[in-house]
Curated annotation (Swiss-Prot):
Pfam families: GCHY-1. Keywords: Hydrolase. It catalyses: GTP + H2O = 7,8-dihydroneopterin 3'-triphosphate + formate + H(+). HAMAP family: GTP_cyclohydrol_B (MF_01527_B). The keyword Ubl conjugation does not apply. The record marks C149 as: May be catalytically important. Its EC number is 3.5.4.16. Belongs to the GTP cyclohydrolase IV family. The keyword Hydrolase applies. This is GTP cyclohydrolase FolE2. It is an enzyme of class 3 (hydrolase).
Amino acid sequence: MNALTLPDVAAQAARQALPLEWVGMCGIALPVFIEGQRLAAKADAGVSLDDGDARGIHMSRLYLGLEAMEQQNLSPALLRQVLQRFLDSHEDLSEAAYLNIHIDLLLRRPALVSPLAGWKNYPVTVSAQLKNKVFHVELKIDVAYSSTCPCSAALARQLIQQQFVDDFANKPLQHADVLAWLGSTQGIVATPHSQRSTAQLHLHLDEFVDELPLTSIINDAEAALGTAVQTAVKRADEQAFALANGQNLMFCEDAARRLNLALRGSPGISQFHVRVIHAESLHAHDAVAESHWRREQP
């Protein structure tokens, strides 16, 4: 019995001749190495279908092209190599290649005061494209932090002042009595509302960047905000966190401005878009602010 040739339907001519901007696969599971860590990732891989007469692309070739990422540290050079493989395997079909890598970056973070430390998760997307021989990389990073409302803090202070007047009016002030009052719920009758907040960073990298500056960008963002969420803590750390929140009262507008100024000084960034989301505990809606920056060309 003669062996039959397997049909290749994708090689047939399209019934409607029309180019497509993007064709590929989303949610491909694969391991990647970032800063020495082997992490589980999901990849979106695709190419343009510029030959409108071709019915489809060769998706298996894209899948195999991702194998180069299994043993090497994720870098702009590796991303470009993979994208070039996509194009080489689709010669005469595609002029542009695209790749998104979705990961949860794990960084070990120390406590504020005690010797404790713990792992913290940062959702990251690394996006790369090679189009008309022009290579480009973008990063999306989510950074969680705490925000305490300045207005709520002022209102709480006013209530405490009023309670002080009510409790000590026409009384001689004794240091011990005032100290005890300040440490009691009778004295501190109100506290400002705080909420867990998120900074969504979308950054365009310079062409000359050799490494993905994930950790340095996260460090710059957290330093600018001053209230990064914590991992393992003792009471001393929780107290230090309360102090940090009190010293860094922030509307969403304040957070967006802090991040804008901080990221301008981060090396390797040509432009960025910042979106901060304060999941209000006072309201059932979020407070949101956005900011853009683009380096001026010399």
